[in-house]
Amino acid sequence: MALSEPILPSFATFASPCERGLQERWPRNEPEAGSTDEDLNSVLDFILSMGLDGLGAENPPEPPPQPPPPAFYYPEPGAPPPYGTPAAGLGTELLRPDLDAPQGPALHGRFLLAPPGRLVKAEPPEVDGGGYGCAAGLARGPRGLKLEGALGATGACMRGPAGRPPPPSDTPPLSPDGPPRLPAPGPRNPFPPPFGPGPSFGGPGPALHYGPPAPGAFGLFDDAAAALGLAPPATRGLLTPPSSPLELLEAKPKRGRRSWPRKRAATHTCSYTNCGKTYTKSSHLKAHLRTHTGEKPYHCNWDGCGWKFARSDELTRHYRKHTGHRPFQCHLCDRAFSRSDHLALHMKRHM
């Protein structure tokens, strides 16, 4: 009866047919116990040696990270790279927090510095503040960059007192005596209205509107004109002040010696025949007539001298011979002469 019953296989043979198929397809080699311990020890020694080299006591402490610079940041497109992979070893995962060096402030948080060409910020048109004393280069700044520290100072300078925008530029007085024009009281717009079209040099641009000058702008010229006896003009041009008082004084004719002598007409003529000489002075003609008549009214009164002369200057030169007076002296040497023509001849020798 026992032989007639069918013999069934054991339960363990078909408990896991999939596992049996996998084992038959990929046979697994069991490693030896001794070699596994040696490999594990070598891996641990390598990891410990690498960790001690990276975290040695001889390395100086790293400086604290500096704060990030003031600039625009934008997130990098794309998914961030994974910090770890499933294939990383056990030792690498354990030592990752100790071996990772702190990243720089510019790349912390997976942010990159944006180039200046990508950022475009629409701003209202700027007008140079004439009376606020701010340089145009500081007020505008480079395009595409955000300067927080510099814009704080320049913004306060451009806003003016009490945080208001600068008023429209007025024409300064043409004279230091005139009081400066103050802006009209009242609320100001945060931005100046756009200027209307106006004449420009070479191309379109904002037209500059000038207000009327101050009442005392021409006070200096009015006082000078009143002192000179000139009536002040009724109307004046906006940018054409009256002439300077110095120019008015120079325009008057000067009273004094002429720059060139006026040539006199020779009206005195000798009446002797075959002579016809003319002179500008009557005394010169009288002396000339004495040459024709032979008259010598000037006599030398020196004792023992009876010389006579027709001209007084000839008597004067003759009298110097008796006295020895020599008024004409050479400035290059010690010689002196009684006559000027003798000194002129002597000066030619020094030349």
Swiss-Prot record:
Amino acid composition bias (Pro residues), ranges on this chain: 60-84, 163-197
A GO molecular-function annotation = sequence-specific double-stranded DNA binding
The record places the motif (9aaTAD) at 42-50
Q: Where is this region: Interaction with WWP1?
A: 110-264
InterPro entries, per the entry: Znf_C2H2_sf (IPR036236), Znf_C2H2_type (IPR013087)
Q: How is it modified after translation?
A: Ubiquitinated. Polyubiquitination involves WWP1 and leads to proteasomal degradation of this protein.
Any GO CC annotation of this UniProt entry: chromatin
Q: Which one Pfam family would you cite for this protein?
A: zf-C2H2
Q: Where in the cell is it found?
A: Nucleus
Whether DNA-binding counts among this entry's keywords is yes
Q: Principal place where this protein is found?
A: nucleus
Specify where the region named Disordered lies, as residue ranges.
Answer: 20-110, 156-209
Q: Which UniProt keywords apply?
A: Activator, DNA-binding, Metal-binding, Nucleus, Phosphoprotein, Repeat, Transcription, Transcription regulation, Ubl conjugation, Zinc, Zinc-finger
In its UniProt record, which GO terms are filed under biological process? cell morphogenesis; cellular response to endothelin; cellular response to fluid shear stress; cellular response to hydrogen peroxide; cellular response to interleukin-1; cellular response to laminar fluid shear stress; cellular response to tumor necrosis factor; cellular stress response to acid chemical
Q: Which residues carry this modification: Phosphothreonine?
A: 171, 240
Q: Which residues are annotated as modified residue Phosphoserine in the UniProt record? A: 243
Reading the lineage from the top rank, the first entry is Eukaryota
What spans are recorded as compositionally biased (Basic and acidic residues)?
A: 21-31
SUPFAM superfamilies linked: beta-beta-alpha zinc fingers
- Residue intervals of every C2H2-type zinc finger in the record: 268-292, 298-322, 328-350
Chain's role: Transcription factor that binds to the CACCC box in the promoter of target genes such as HBB/beta globin or NOV and activates their transcription. Might be involved in transcriptional regulation by modulating the binding of the RARA nuclear receptor to RARE DNA elements.
The domain comment in this protein's record states:
The 9aaTAD motif is a transactivation domain present in a large number of yeast and animal transcription factors.
- Identify the PANTHER family for this entry: KRUEPPEL-LIKE FACTOR 2 (PTHR23235:SF109), KRUEPPEL-LIKE TRANSCRIPTION FACTOR (PTHR23235)
**What family does the Swiss-Prot or TrEMBL record give for this protein?**
Belongs to the krueppel C2H2-type zinc-finger protein family.
Q: How does it assemble?
A: Interacts with WWP1.
Q: What is this protein called?
A: Krueppel-like factor 2
